[in-house]
Each structure stands twice: as C-alpha cells, then as structure tokens.
C-alpha cells in the first residue's frame, strides 16, 4: 500500500509538471527535445550572457566527441602546464608538470568545476587555449 501511495504521488508530480509546462527563473533558457528537435522552452534566447560554465560544457562535449571518434582514450594522459596550474577560481588542484588521465580531468571538470582541468584538456586537444577556443567556435 505504501509503495502504491509513493508511486501515485510520483506520477501526480510528474503529470502536474507536464500539464503546466516548463518554467524557469533563469534569465535565458532553451530546452530542445533531443529526439524530435522540438523546442520545449525558449526564454530570451538572443540575450547576450557571459559564457561562465558553458565553456566547460563545450570542453566536455569536445572531449567526449574525441573519445567517441577514437582520437582519445580515458586512460590517455595530458601534462599540466604552468598556465593551467596558475589558473585561479574553482580548481582541481593539479600540480604543474604532472600527467593526468583524461578520465580524472573529466571528473575534475564535472565535480570541481575545475578551471585548471579545462585548460589541461584544451591544451591537450588543441595545443593552446586560444587554438581550442577557435575549435569551439567552429564547432
């Protein structure tokens, strides 16, 4: 009986979300159905905003794309540059000169939001952050 109650409550919550539609307090938002391409939510999508963690998501996208294409493997390593080591903000706390597995760098970006991990990945994929920024723009 308890399971039925919990399940019914869950369905009610899900159904009320579906009926009401999506909403957000975010200044801008875009939600697209991955299968149909249908825009589910569009809110002020042409408003310029700072990239913030969007560049981290794009970095991960490009890393996963390279993994899918066989250009990288999770056990491959990239060396931590001085530039990555010195980067401020949120960090994975990498040490200059150490070699870090792609798998660990991905975790550092996702869990720590590590700026240093993103720089190491960018440099490993494109040689420099600047080259990587160009690749992201092209992509």
Regions found by a protein language model. Name each.
Residues 1-2, 73:
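Serine/threonine-rich low-complexity intrinsically disordered regions
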Residues 2-10:
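Sec-dependent signal peptide recognition
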Residues 14-18:
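N-terminal signal peptide c-region/cleavage motif recognized by signal peptidases
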Residues 19-139:
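Active-site-adjacent loops and short helices of periplasmic peptidoglycan-processing enzymes
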């Amino acid at each position: 009986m308890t399971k039925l109650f919990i399940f019914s409550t869950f369905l009610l919550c899900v159904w009320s979300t579906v009926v009401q539609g999506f909403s957000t307090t975010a200044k801008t938002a875009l939600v697209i159905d991955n299968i149909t391409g249908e825009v589910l939510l569009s809110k002020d999508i042409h408003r310029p905003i700072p990239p913030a963690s969007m560049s981290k998501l794009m970095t991960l996208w490009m890393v996963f794309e390279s993994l899918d294409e066989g250009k990288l493997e999770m056990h491959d390593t990239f060396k931590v540059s001085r530039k990555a080591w010195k980067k401020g903000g949120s960090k994975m706390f990498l040490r200059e000169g150490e070699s870090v597995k792609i798998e660990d760098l991905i975790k550092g970006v996702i869990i720590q939001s590590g700026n240093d991990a993103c720089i190491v990945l960018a440099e490993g994929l494109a040689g420099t952050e600047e080259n990587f920024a160009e690749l992201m723009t092209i992509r």
